[in-house]
């Protein structure tokens, strides 16, 4: 599914999970979001839950159309965003993983067999990465709702990849009132970090 001419949605729908994180009922499933940004260099934003590795990798391969990804951007280390890092790197071993210092500390703990010393790009808050006409800016969002979270802003397309900050329950192939499930998600998942989410709105408005 195209978001823009250069940004392709490669996420998956989950209708297998009854309780998200073991406590939130999701009668209409969940969507795990991931994107491919195509330019002179190609970036993949986030992975998905490990149960959907094959479907996600097929989606990524179709979006790449025979090209190889240059970067895998990890915005959040919760498993529904990061579980397929290892599977991805087995297929695309020359890819550089983009994250912050806390991201790479977590990767080292979650994926002990991975050696990323020459395959990582550690970014700081406000750093940019140029793919060609697309310039990506990384905006740290600690405790929205984990300490390593960062958002990615594409200044060319004016698209914000917002990790969990503005998420919702529900798969994308189910028609439902967006605001009801977004409100329930916010209250359950990130509401306790409301001040941090408000800060996201403030500093992304200046990006």
Residue ranges of model-derived segments:
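Conserved beta-strand hairpin/beta-sheet module of binuclear metal-dependent hydrolase folds
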Residues: 2-64, 151-154, 158-162
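Metallo-beta-lactamase
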Residues: 2-5, 99-149, 193-199
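Short catalytic-loop micro-motif centered on adjacent basic/acidic residues
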Residues: 43-46, 71-74, 137-138
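Active-site metal-binding motif and surrounding structural segment of the metallo-beta-lactamase
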Residues: 51-98
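Short, basic, glycine/proline-bearing loop/turn elements
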Residues: 70-71, 133-134, 181-189
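Internal, well-ordered alpha/beta segment that forms a basic, Gly-enriched binding/recognition surface
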Residues: 138-169
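Active-site gating loops and adjacent loop-to-helix segments of metal-dependent hydrolytic enzymes
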Residues: 166-188
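Conserved small/polar residues in nucleotide/adenosyl-binding loops
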Residues: 203-207
């Amino acid at each position: 599914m195209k978001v823009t001419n250069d940004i392709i949605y490669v996420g998956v729908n989950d209708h297998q999970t009854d309780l998200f994180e073991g406590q939130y009922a999701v009668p209409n499933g969940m969507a795990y979001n991931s994107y491919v940004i195509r330019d002179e260099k190609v970036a993949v934003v986030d992975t998905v839950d490990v149960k959907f590795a094959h479907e996600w990798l097929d989606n990524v391969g179709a979006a790449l159309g025979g090209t190889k990804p240059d970067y895998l951007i990890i915005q959040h280390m919760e498993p529904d965003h990061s579980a397929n890092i290892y599977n991805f790197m087995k297929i695309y071993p020359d890819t550089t993983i983009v994250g912050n210092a806390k991201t790479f500390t977590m990767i080292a703990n979650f994926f002990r067999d991975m050696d990323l010393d020459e395959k990582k790009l550690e970014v700081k808050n406000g750093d940019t990465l140029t793919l060609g006409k697309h310039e990506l800016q990384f905006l740290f969002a600690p405790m929205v709702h984990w300490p390593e979270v960062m958002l990615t802003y594409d200044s060319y397309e004016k698209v914000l990849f917002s990790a969990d900050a503005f998420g919702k329950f529900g798969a994308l192939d189910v028609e439902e009132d967006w605001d009801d499930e977004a409100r329930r998600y916010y209250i359950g998942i990130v509401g306790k970090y409301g001040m941090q989410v408000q800060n996201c709105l403030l500093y992304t408005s200046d990006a």
